């Protein structure tokens, strides 16, 4: 079973991916975690590292190449990243999930996780980060991140908590592959 989980910052992709990976005993690879780790190692904020990635395509291209290799080579995997669904487009039998939430909800969640600035500052950072990423995705791959048509499931994490989302996704997954 191969599953991709994508969404904008603060939408809950990492949380839901971890729950799915635990429930189905799947390996979880999170490109967002990799990106954040590299930013920390370079002692840069996500916005600074994103700006650097805008100027140096090799950063995104290396991470994305790795995603394509991973989704092709693993049978039991959850790949969590903004572009995971796009990276798996040509791989058969991959369930592609997009998790969405309104910007203010996502900013509040990011603040709970990072606790570094005010709401307005984080709102500005998040909008800047999303613009940076959208520009890079369009420039590198001609991907419009707002086009959700490639996803099998789009779910709103403002309406349901992570456990309710897990329950919804279990019904969808089990109907496709049968219960594990």
From Swiss-Prot:
Which EC numbers characterise this protein's activity in its record?
2.7.4.25
- Asked if the Swiss-Prot or TrEMBL record annotates the protein with the keyword Nucleotide-binding, the reply is yes
Instruction: Write down a Pfam family by its short name.
Output: Cytidylate_kin2
Quick one: where is this thing mainly located? Answer: cytoplasm
Gene Ontology CC annotations of this record:
cytoplasm
GO function term, MF aspect, one: dCMP kinase activity
Q: Does the keyword Endoplasmic reticulum apply?
A: no
- What keywords sit in the KW lines? ATP-binding, Cytoplasm, Kinase, Nucleotide-binding, Transferase
Localisation? Cytoplasm
Q: Which reaction does it catalyse?
A: CMP + ATP = CDP + ADP; dCMP + ATP = dCDP + ADP
Q: Which GO terms fall under biological process for this protein?
A: pyrimidine nucleotide metabolic process
Protein name, entry field:
Cytidylate kinase
